Amino acid sequence: MTRKKAGDYTPEVLRLFDKFVHGDISRREFVDRAAAFTVAGASAAALLETLLPDFVTGQVVAENDARLTTSRREYDSPRGAGRMSGYLARPAAGADRLPGVLVIHENRGLNPHIEDIARRLALEGYLAFAPDALTPLGGYPGNEDAARELFQRLDREALVEDFVAAFEFLAGLPDCTGKVGAVGFCFGGGMVNQLAVRVPELGAGVAFYGGQVPAELVPSIKAPLLLHYAGIDERINAGWPAYETALRANGIEYEAYVYDGANHGFNNDTTPRFDAAAAELAWRRTLDFFTSNLKG
């Protein structure tokens, strides 16, 4: 079966899907409202299924890739949820000590796509650690709908503490140089912005279509930032002008790019919103940014 692309859907359906993914409407509401945009003989429920992630087809680096060593690791988050879990990936050969990258998932916890992102970074010479924010609720449940519902039950303040603790855990590993950056997607992109405020030791922050922090918090940012925005993303982009003004006013080092024609989630190659050209360019910029700030 040929994989669908964003262009195969009407803008109205993609907007409804974005609302569904972010918990603004239920599955039933999506089906009811998307029915107006289906073609004869197709159901809105079937339409939704084509928009959901295909983790097998979208995988880039296999779980058992012999070039890597991967493991599940636990760490303490005393100011957050307590005992947390995550996925650690590193090259099987090469330098004993490597710079670290914290990989922060979307609003569904540590799913196979984010584990794949960690493996991709490990192949680039990083110690990549992807925490699972759903650990206190049993971890990623293997189902995106269930994961989304669980995520809404998490304490937002504790969440930030869990990722601060993850940064500290990664930076303190014996095989980490102590230079640690962070990359996040959607919820994770917003968390990168929050970590930039909370963690002065953050070596570099890369946010893919992530929510911004309030302007009054920007003076606390010490890390250089790389910010990727989708051209078609009203919800996230609405906060960008004020954020950019605050970054400039406070002399924060940053790069920002808007990928025209790309939808929110354009880097996620497991869904039709994936935009290969935008994702390739954003990923190349991300790797160059980490090289400049973490490997020097």
Ranges and model annotations:
Residues 57-94:
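N-terminal cap/lid segment of alpha/beta-hydrolase-fold proteins
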Residues 165-222:
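Primarily recognizes the serine-hydrolase "nucleophile elbow" in alpha/beta-hydrolase
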Residues 227-229:
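Short beta-strand/loop motif that positions the catalytic acidic residue
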